[in-house]
Amino acid sequence: MMETPAESVRARVSSVTFYNVTQTAGRWWAIWVVGIVPIKREDVETLIVVQACQPPLGGSLEPPVVNAPSTTELNFLRWERELRRSGGLIAMLADAAEKDLFDLSFRTRDRRLLSAARVEDEQGLIFQPLFPAQVVCQSCSGDDGRDQQPPPVDGFGSEMEGEQTCPHAQRHSESPGQLDVYIRTPRGDVFTYSTETPDDPSPVPFRDILRPVTYEVDLVSSDGATGRGGDARRHRVSLKILEPAGGFESWLVNSWSMAGGGLYAFLRSIYASCYANHRGTKPIFYLLDPELCPGGSDFQPYVPGFPFLPIHYVGRARPAFWHRAPHSEGLLLLDLNLGVSGTPLADALLGLDARSGQRRGSLLLQQIWPPTRKEINPRHVCTREGGEGGGEDETTVVGRAEATAILEADATWWLYELARCHLSARGAPVGTPDGGGQARDAQTWLRALHRYGTSDTRRALGGLYTAVTRVLLHAAADLGLTWAYADEFILGFVAPTSAHPSEEPLAQAFLQGVKDSEDASRLDRDVMGGEATVARRHIRVKARRGPGCLLMAIFQGDLYVGGCREHSGPFLVWHEAFSWTLDQLAARPEADKAPPSHDHLLTLVRDLTRRLAPGRRRNRFWALPRAWLQRLRRAGLRLSGSHVCLLDKDGARPAPCQTATEHGLSPTAYFREIMAFLLDVISALHPGYTIPMEITRETDLLMTVLSLF
């Protein structure tokens, strides 16, 4: 018996992708390709991980002809993700956080991983991710796929070989009529590819960006020894993989490469060129597009196998935890109706250590308020307005409170730190405020835990939210403040008209009350141990003088607050118009006595037009807010994170996140929503009110003018 040379390297894990399963020596073997970036190097290298497994459903998978995975194939991909969590080397690497370092030992001959140990002391090493390669795909007959119609709202697609395919499976059944690809690496290398027939069997010159490497991997022996008489050769499998060439570890693609099907056609051409003469096991190849999900998805595409690197698109928002390699790759499975939501696999995909079983805080309160709570204090609610028979989302709730001062407390970061510790998150799902982290990223992670997590996770998160809310309520009550509204992780309080506090001392007194709270200290100690009080300093508090009247409204599932006078210039997004409208109504001296006058409404409508006009040429400006999208998705709209949703004369429809506004966009539809909101609010404050006909005619004229540009 002869020892096979082995090497060692210290590196971080950039990706974990599945090659396939194969059968040899009477057993089934699962094979993964692990991308690593050794310290002080700027190229991705690959290692092979092999693990014995139970026979998978359907055996090994052959690459599909179209990007339309069947139910069996999708369940196979879920089975593979569950297998990663079963233990062994692959579980450790698949759970790696973005900045984790490992000491890895592998066989020189076939680069099969032999051992892995997490490095606890990083000795001051600075983590530096590799930049992605920028990929632009222009495809489809017409204008980059712009002629494609939105998918119909239906159930499963057509039958393929007796099996159901996932929703919208036929979207890429036809190849684009033309394909142009442009790729630029971080080192400045440029790759271009153009063809009028993407299915052309001629080889694609891809080796400048993806370097093919073939290994003869011994599946049975992992101790570095070779067998006698060539027995080991019978247990070897030929694997052909692609390694990134050019100093990148992922692709960042434009949204049209997904919508037009060009990216899949390009990768399929590479696959055909690479494996045409390969006699060994071929890798799986799926590009799981968010638009394959029944309601679309905000998550990134999932590429479980070939081409062995993460692919992200330029979307309307990319919270940091979506990109935490490698465990976050596969979040799309949560929206594919595979039964993943609510399982330990969902917790793992969201960055939780589902196997730890060690959660502090056994004395947490039971959930009273859900983290997604949007509510106006019933004491301040005037009335509810809305269409007959409409659901909760179609009902407008209007509230009014007397206030000489308004205080708003944002507990996002405190709740995030509590959840991260209590739920045993692997690493930091998002960056901290001190490190440049964004509150919206933390909010997105918390919402995802509430929506997709296991019942234990949701229950624990609800208990933490309830405990945090109680601390804030008690701190406010000690200052004579009453709560006015709750907008998820933000609570608003008002000071009565009998009080005359100044803004800065009020905010400082509130923060001091939270800091001195025994309940808060007990919560921090119980959940975070020695990290007590660290997170509470990130509570954001804003206090301001009130105009004497605070107006609040829940419209289309979103909560808007007026009376804060924060909208003095052009709108950044169109739906700022709702809060601005409340500001204008609250600022009137006669707000509590009489409805707005004709002149006041006319001025309001004209000012509204001036604030909307600067953004009329940007799709992002006209994008519908998140709460509206949830309702539309329940009604059957499919929307991916690479698109926004716009209103045209026929209703809501997806549109790409691009600079120029779609020609079909209808400012009239947006004005109609704003005017409906205005009427609901005034009718709640002054029952029986109707908008004068002159205002309606003026509004129609202004909408017509705005539509011309």
Curated annotation (Swiss-Prot):
Keywords: Early protein, Host nucleus. Residues 141-176 are annotated as: Disordered. GO terms for biological process: viral genome replication. Its main location: host cell. It is found in: Host nucleus. Belongs to the herpesviridae HEPA family. This is DNA helicase/primase complex-associated protein. It comes from Epstein-Barr virus (strain B95-8) (HHV-4).
